[in-house]
Curated annotation (Swiss-Prot):
Any one Gene Ontology cellular component term annotated for this protein: chloroplast
Subunit and partners: Component of the 30S ribosomal translation pre-initiation complex which assembles on the 30S ribosome in the order IF-2 and IF-3, IF-1 and N-formylmethionyl-tRNA(fMet); mRNA recruitment can occur at any time during PIC assembly.
Compartments where found: Plastid, Chloroplast
Name of this chain's protein: Translation initiation factor IF-1, chloroplastic
Family affiliation: Belongs to the IF-1 family.
Free-text function comment from the UniProt entry: One of the essential components for the initiation of protein synthesis. Stabilizes the binding of IF-2 and IF-3 on the 30S subunit to which N-formylmethionyl-tRNA(fMet) subsequently binds. Helps modulate mRNA selection, yielding the 30S pre-initiation complex (PIC). Upon addition of the 50S ribosomal subunit IF-1, IF-2 and IF-3 are released leaving the mature 70S translation initiation complex.
Designated gene of the protein: infA
Domain S1-like, first and last residues per copy: 1-71
Keywords: Chloroplast, Initiation factor, Plastid, Protein biosynthesis, RNA-binding, rRNA-binding
Length: 77
């Protein structure tokens, strides 16, 4: 049986080495996020200030996997 994960939205606050990021969730928690393989293969750039969807395990809520970069409402791309 596959493990259930929580999906949150948050804001990238800091970029760390090796594809790791500090993410502030909408509920004000600060967790460590790493880039999923699909985002890494697609060469999607994630920068501080971006909004992302992050998948958090029920067993370790201090780390999560970034699964989607949300589009900014004010950008024109």
């Amino acid at each position: 049986m596959k493990e259930q994960k929580w999906i949150h939205e948050g804001l990238i606050t800091e970029s760390l080495p090796n594809g790791m990021f500090r993410v502030r969730l909408d509920n004000e928690d600060l967790i460590l996020g790493y880039v999923s393989g699909k985002i890494r293969r697609s060469f999607i750039r994630i920068l501080p200030g971006d909004r992302v969807k992050i998948e958090v395990s029920r067993y370790d809520s201090s780390r999560g996997r970034i699964i989607y970069r949300l589009r900014n409402k004010d950008s024109n791309d």
